Regions:
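Active-site cofactor/cluster-binding pocket
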Residues: 1-197
Length: 197
């Protein structure tokens, strides 16, 4: 999984929370954050591998199966689809747009859309979308159970009121994500697709 976000949105923390939930559910994980001296708002990425076998590879993920994008404007700056595996990629995107308003490359076969910024402003009063997008990821992929994901929040990062707010954020992200499955057929990279809702 490759997480894309901006500094301050919590992409690295999102990967850490998901990693903990995956371990609880019996998976092996390997996480690699990727950030330098970027300021708040600059593009950042985090990488998370999981498997039912020990993972030895510790590099960045250049050919992701899944992409989680925490920011609806990031695609203007970063090619979030770079390296996505052909005809099996999954995109979980923070956006208020509908599927018909987005340009999705043909190598993506499933898309989860969540208006995470609106939810974040409602829950937190600012656009921190990481836990909301974890809920969206679970809705789109069933990678872990929703209960497991919310149960590890207190162990990884949050306490008291912040814990309650982030549990609500995950649940709302899960509930308000719209999942689209795109029919699998061989397409060239130049072709466009019409999604089925």
């Amino acid at each position: 999984i490759r997480f894309h976000g901006r500094g301050g949105q919590g992409a690295v923390l999102a990967a850490k929370i998901l990693a903990k939930a995956l371990v609880v559910e019996g998976e092996y994980i390997k996480g690699v954050p990727s950030f330098g001296f970027e300021r708040r708002g600059a593009p950042v990425a985090a990488f998370l591998r999981f498997d039912d076998h020990v993972i030895r590879q510790t590099t960045n993920i250049y050919r992701p199966d899944w992409i989680v994008c925490l920011d609806p404007t990031l695609f203007k700056t970063v090619d979030i689809f770079e390296g996505v595996k052909e005809h099996r990629g999954i995109l979980v995107q923070a956006t208020a747009k509908s599927m018909n308003e987005l340009t999705i490359p043909p190598r993506i076969v499933k898309v989860g859309l969540c208006d995470a910024v609106r939810i974040a402003l409602d829950v937190f009063g600012r656009s921190i979308t990481n836990t909301i997008m974890l809920g969206a990821l679970v809705r789109t992929t069933d990678v872990v159970s929703l209960d497991c994901l919310t149960s590890v929040l207190g162990e990884v990062a949050f306490r008291d009121a912040a814990l309650d707010a982030n549990v609500e954020a995950i649940r709302r992200g899960y509930q308000q994500t719209v999942v689209h499955t795109i029919p699998r057929r061989m397409l060239s990279d130049e072709e466009t697709i019409t999604p089925h809702v």
